């Protein structure tokens, strides 16, 4: 089966956010460019479907108006998401890097928590830390440890997150997120390499992050 590109999907604009609907027929490879999003309708197939990331990093979030795009998980190669276990309104999958995934995967059995449940638990723990600064510190460490790589005294995350999204993840306003990020820049603990979509963080910052358990 040939890979499908984002252009093959029907277009919709809910609540000011653009996405495309996932095709009803299972596909062995669907490709998205960074910033593109597909919505998965759990009612489109009896019993739902199982998505598996083949390459890249994705953000899974709830499309409900009430939750305003609440992040459920970040997924990378090998991670799966069962659509029948999530919001009845469906889920959205956003490509943070060039992304390839399949919608006809066989669910892994006997793995305990699935990828989405485990991520949601960790994000919930972060939201309960005492201050916005601690929550940001823990969030950056979680993302780097799960999705990034260490290069000497620095750690690289292969994508950037907007200040608005950081605010959603740590339960703060965009203004607070911007202030905290600016502080890390002044302390030379965070950098955004020119011409690259990545985020660079000091290894010492990641090592000193709060332990989530």
Model-derived features: where do they sit?
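Cyclic nucleotide-binding regulatory module and flanking cytosolic helices
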Residues: 1-38, 46, 80-81
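His/acidic/aromatic-lined binding-pocket segments of jelly-roll/cupin-type domains
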Residues: 29-30, 39-42, 47-54, 72-73, ...
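Short histidine-centered beta-strand/loop micro-motifs
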Residues: 39-45, 63, 83-85, 125-128, ...
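Glycine- and acidic-residue-biased ligand/ion/polar-headgroup-sensing regions
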Residues: 46-65, 76-78
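Cyclic-nucleotide recognition modules
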Residues: 65-123
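Polybasic "coupling" helices that flank or enter modular domains
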Residues: 111-172
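Phosphate-/nucleic-acid-contacting segments
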Residues: 147-213
């Amino acid at each position: 089966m040939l890979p499908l590109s984002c252009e093959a999907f029907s277009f919709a604009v809910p609540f000011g956010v653009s996405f495309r609907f996932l095709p009803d027929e299972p596909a062995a490879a669907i490709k998205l460019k960074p910033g593109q999003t597909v919505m998965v309708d759990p009612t489109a197939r009896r019993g739902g479907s199982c998505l598996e990331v083949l390459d890249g990093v994705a953000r899974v979030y709830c499309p409900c108006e009430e939750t305003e795009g609440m992040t459920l998980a970040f997924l990378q190669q090998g991670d799966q998401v069962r659509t029948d276990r999530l919001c009845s309104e469906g889920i959205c999958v956003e490509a943070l890097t060039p992304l390839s995934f399949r919608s006809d995967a066989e669910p892994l059995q006997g793995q305990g928590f699935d990828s989405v449940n485990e991520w949601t638990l960790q994000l919930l723990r972060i939201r309960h830390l005492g201050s916005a600064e601690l929550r940001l510190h823990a969030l950056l460490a979680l993302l780097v440890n799960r999705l990034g790589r260490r290069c000497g005294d620095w750690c690289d995350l292969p994508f950037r997150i907007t200040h608005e999204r950081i605010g959603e993840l740590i339960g703060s306003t965009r203004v607070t997120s911007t202030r905290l990020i600016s502080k890390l820049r002044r302390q030379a603990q965070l950098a955004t390499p020119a011409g690259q979509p990545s985020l660079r963080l000091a290894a010492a910052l990641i090592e000193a992050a709060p332990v989530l358990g």
